[in-house]
Amino acid sequence: TYTVQVKDANNCIVKKDYTVSQPTSLYLTLSKKAVSCFGGSDGAVNSLATGGTPPYSYKWMPGNISGQKLSNLQVGTYTVTVTDFKGCTLSSAITIDQPIALSLVTGSKNEICDAPNGKAFITVSGGTAPYTYSWPSLNIQQDTASGLHAGSYTVVVKDKNQCSASSTI
């Protein structure tokens, strides 16, 4: 607080107190949405500035992109710099992740004596569990198909994010 005192030619005095305040510190909150499928580009980031003196401007790197939000992002690290009305700045980085690629390991047991007793099975890793299985030519929805004749069979696997992989056994 500062006091200003003014005295005129007639010795009249006026005093006035003034308080000079500082804005609250600039603060930045970041949130993200990871890429759904390995190698995808559907990640997103959002930034929210508070404190300082609004309005705020946002600049993202890489790409020198303006805006509070970014979408359609690939895996990587993104840095945002927020600038308030008075030119105060604050920077922060956030990393967009992705799941491990879906990996399928297949196996089979051959039919014996021309009887429909063959079996095909699959083990899945990567992606985001749980998984769904589809053997299109067999109308089977699980990780093992049994009662099979000799031949080729295709299985399609989808994870929780609808990422898919297929294999022919």
Predicted features, each with a name:
Residues 1-169:
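Proline- and Ser/Thr-rich low-complexity, intrinsically disordered segments
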